[in-house]
């Protein structure tokens, strides 16, 4: 979060173009485990039908995703492709800390999926960031909680209502800490 979205785009030219085509998509970025994958893929297919757009699946298990019209299997993606997928997504669904941070940084409509309870999620790194930014309403425990209207509009979150101010404050504290640490090391 030390870099803004504009700084990421400036320094990583590949994220200026899309890697999955021009049609709108929801990005599903997850650290899926094999035992969970098949049930989640079925839920993603249903979500795709409900929201009227394809779901780009970026996960270690993408190769196991069913070959179907609803899902775009992203089998090879390094950091540049990840940034491109994130930047160009209409919305993001993630269970990943970094997926959460980049969704916030790129001002995406997003949801954080947890298999536990919302209360449990608030105790995780993701949950703590969401609390600090006033975005705990983005936690879902079921894909049916994702609003198709929010996905389609892509503007479900008013970042200017407080999240941006909190993010700037967090960024400022982190940079000050790093500068102090470097100065201490030099002495």
Each model region followed by its residue ranges:
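Active-site anion-handling motifs in enzyme catalytic cores
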Residues: 1-187
């Amino acid at each position: 979060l030390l870099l803004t979205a504009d700084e990421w785009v400036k320094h990583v030219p590949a994220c200026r173009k899309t890697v999955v085509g021009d049609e709108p998509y929801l990005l599903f970025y997850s650290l899926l485990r094999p035992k969970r994958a098949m049930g989640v893929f079925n839920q993603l297919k249903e979500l795709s039908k409900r929201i009227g757009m394809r779901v780009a699946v970026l996960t270690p298990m993408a190769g196991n995703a069913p070959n179907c019209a609803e899902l775009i299997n992203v089998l090879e993606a390094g950091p540049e492709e990840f940034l491109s997928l994130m930047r160009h997504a209409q919305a993001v669904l993630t269970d990943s800390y970094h997926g959460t941070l980049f969704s916030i940084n790129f001002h995406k409509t997003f949801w954080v999926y947890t298999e536990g309870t919302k209360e449990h999620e608030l105790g995780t790194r993701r949950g703590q960031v969401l609390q600090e930014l006033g975005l705990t309403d983005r936690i879902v425990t079921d894909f049916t909680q994702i609003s198709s209207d929010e996905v389609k509009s892509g503007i479900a979150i008013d970042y200017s209502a407080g999240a941006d101010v909190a993010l700037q404050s967090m960024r400022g504290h982190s940079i000050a800490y790093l500068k102090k640490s470097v100065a201490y090391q030099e002495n």
